[in-house]
Swiss-Prot record:
Biological processes, Gene Ontology terms: L-histidine biosynthetic process
Subcellular location: Cytoplasm
Protein name: Imidazoleglycerol-phosphate dehydratase
Gene: hisB
Any GO molecular function: imidazoleglycerol-phosphate dehydratase activity
EC number: 4.2.1.19
Family per record: Belongs to the imidazoleglycerol-phosphate dehydratase family.
UniProt pathway annotation: Amino-acid biosynthesis; L-histidine biosynthesis; L-histidine from 5-phospho-alpha-D-ribose 1-diphosphate: step 6/9
InterPro entries: IGPD_sf, ImidazoleglycerolP_deHydtase, ImidazoleglycerP_deHydtase_CS, Ribosomal_Su5_D2-typ_SF
Organism annotation: Psychrobacter sp. (strain PRwf-1)
Principal location class: cytoplasm
HAMAP family the record matches: HisB
Bilayer-spanning residue ranges: none
Keyword annotations from UniProtKB, A to Z: Amino-acid biosynthesis, Cytoplasm, Histidine biosynthesis, Lyase
Amino acid sequence: MTTEIHSNPANRPNRIASVERNTAETQVSVTVNLDGTGQGKIDTGVPFLDHMLDQIKRHGLFDLDITCKGDTYIDDHHSIEDTGITLGQAFAKALGDKKGIRRYGHFYAPLDESLTRAVVDISGRPGLHMDIPFTRSHVGNFDVDLFSEFFFGFVNHAWMTVHLDNLKGKNSHHQIECTFKAFARALRMACEYDERALNTLPSTKEAL
């Protein structure tokens, strides 16, 4: 016997949220539908980040519309971090009271020689635990140090615990991309509804 997992039971509205973040450094707008089909448009002004957010959209089956106008003439740091922050806020808002969700998700994703494990807990306790031994400092113009800035921004504002471990990898592009794919699948699993527990919180504390 298996547990039935559904993105959204027929009697519940889609979980949709929109958030804007405007600072002297960036103007970010995010709309997310947790119960989508992987549709939407992404334009952050950082092409490599757009490519990675497409992985979240496609493999998580989240509808995502994201725009960011930032001070990329300085560097990409503010745009990447603030996109992570705003996306995290949108997920937290869309999840609502969290009743009925699976809460936990995990996935292994390969990309050629690279393999990453992602584990997500929609715990209400933000924390990023990451071990990605990059083999170079840049992928094209993308500084790999900014990879963690996106995820720190996301988890701190989505109120999730996330573990990301690249178990094998030599190509930094592959390491990053398979990490985003694994994260997308794990996040999808954690956000989905558990048919057997639709009206309860997945916590013995009765709080998340």
